[in-house]
Amino acid sequence: MKKRGIVAVIVLLLIGLDQLVKNYVVQQIPLGEVRSWIPSLVSLTYLQNRGAAFSMLQDQQWFFAIITLVVMAGAIWYLHKHMEDSLWLVFGLTLIIAGGLGNFIDRMSQGFVVDMFHLDFINFAIFNVADSYLTVGVIVLLIAMLKEEVNGNKN
């Protein structure tokens, strides 16, 4: 299987995991209820996020849809163009694409994004699997850029 096909399968599997977790939460946890998952570390709750990160820009679903489509198109184009470059770059973009599309599916099908993870040890926003993909993907891209910068300075 070509590298592009492998990346596409990974993106689909990641989206599937995100949607599976969201579906479980919607089916098993009443809206707003908090359940301890890993005591003193992580709780599960069911939150309908109609905004962006930290619930900003509430009820602007078409704005988010357009932005997501533009960013995803750019990320997919860049990934396609640089597929043979850095494994870090491919990994980071794969996570970003899966995370963006996972939340996009929620916005288009329900009008909100399902969030569920609450960190008990810090005051932090409730987030979901797709948000985790996006966050880790951005960190991996930053590492890829730093590695490229360091390697570029050696030449």
Residue ranges and their predicted role:
Residues 1-155:
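Alpha-helical transmembrane bundles and membrane-interface segments of multipass inner-membrane proteins
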